[in-house]
Amino acid sequence: MKKVRLTREGYEKLKKELEDLKRKFMYEISERIKEARELGDLSENSEYEAAKNEQGRVGSRIMEIEQILSNAEIIEDSEESDEVTLGKWVVIKNLDTGEEHKFRIVTPQEADFFAQKLSSDSPLGKSLLGRKVGDVVKVKAPSGVQRYQVIAVMNK
């Protein structure tokens, strides 16, 4: 598997999720399976089926996170510059509506729109990478082409 680029914050978040899932996997789900087995006939035991399904989902996620972390390359904060790169915060202005938005450009594994983390693989993320303060980018959206100007770029 190729290297997976993550910010330090994203790496730590995945480590915590892995710890939490392992704890859940080892204790909570195992206990639920044990309790469901004690109820008798497993062929018609919906609690047992639900616990086994959750065990499968959690186990898959644990393996996925372990693979990501074992292949992780941490993106360290770079020197202050006005160029948009992975891990940087960027303020953009929609030139059609005048609205300003602030995002952190992150890898797809870390993307979270509600936490203002924009995937570098998204149309907007791709168009912003390598741009500098003052640059204007055009992005195709369902509502048509949107124009954004880079207002600020910062590490934090």
UniProtKB/Swiss-Prot annotation:
One Gene Ontology term from the biological process aspect of the record: regulation of DNA-templated transcription elongation
Record-level Gene Ontology MF annotations: DNA binding; RNA polymerase binding
UniProt keyword Metal-binding present: no
Pfam hit, one: GreA_GreB
InterPro entries assigned: GreA/GreB_C_sf (IPR036953), TF_GreA/GreB_CS (IPR018151), Tscrpt_elong_fac_GreA (IPR006359), Tscrpt_elong_fac_GreA/B (IPR028624), Tscrpt_elong_fac_GreA/B_C (IPR001437), Tscrpt_elong_fac_GreA/B_fam (IPR023459), Tscrpt_elong_fac_GreA/B_N (IPR022691), Tscrpt_elong_fac_GreA/B_N_sf (IPR036805)
Xref: SUPFAM superfamilies: FKBP-like, GreA transcript cleavage protein, N-terminal domain
Coiled coil regions in record: 1-32
Keyword field contains Acyltransferase: no
Keyword tags: Coiled coil, DNA-binding, Transcription, Transcription regulation
PANTHER family: TRANSCRIPTION ELONGATION FACTOR GREA
Family: Belongs to the GreA/GreB family.
NCBIfam families: greA (TIGR01462), PRK00226.1-4 (NF001263)
Protein function: Necessary for efficient RNA polymerase transcription elongation past template-encoded arresting sites. The arresting sites in DNA have the property of trapping a certain fraction of elongating RNA polymerases that pass through, resulting in locked ternary complexes. Cleavage of the nascent transcript by cleavage factors such as GreA or GreB allows the resumption of elongation from the new 3'terminus. GreA releases sequences of 2 to 3 nucleotides.
Stated name of the protein: Transcription elongation factor GreA
Native species: Thermotoga maritima (strain ATCC 43589 / DSM 3109 / JCM 10099 / NBRC 100826 / MSB8)
Gene transcribed to yield this protein: greA
